[in-house]
Amino acid sequence: MEYIMNDVLSGAIVPVLLGLTPEAGETAHRMYRRHGVISHVFCDRIPLASRLSLCMKFHRIPQTAGEQLMLQALSDFADQLGNADLILYLIPCNEHYTNLVWDHAEDLERRFVIADRAEMERVWFGAEAAPLEEVTA
């Protein structure tokens, strides 16, 4: 618990990224540069170079463990932060995790704000890459 709370301020947004992809890495760096927040990345493996990142904390969930373990890990993570005044922002960073989130959205929405497709594209590629009508809508 202390490991998580040291980097989280009351009232802050906590990005929770699913999958270690180039989009996840760029999203974590962008969130850190723009807002000063550390992203929590749930993934199946952690490359050595990524372990040195100052803007990401990793939670390793073996891919062979299946969906239920990932959902349980997310639930436990949210429960650890349950009494804090935080917004847990769940961002799936590949198609597999996007499908997982959509399939279990009802359960996950109790604890997380879930990015929709337009939000994911803005977060992954930056607001400047999204069409103007989507950004201003």
List where the protein language model places each region.
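Flexible, charged surface loops at secondary-structure boundaries
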Residues: 6-12, 33, 81-85
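Short, polar loop motifs at secondary-structure junctions
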Residues: 42-49
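Glycine-rich adenosine-cofactor-binding loop
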Residues: 15-31
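Nucleotide-activated donor-dependent transferases that construct or modify glycoconjugates
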Residues: 2-20
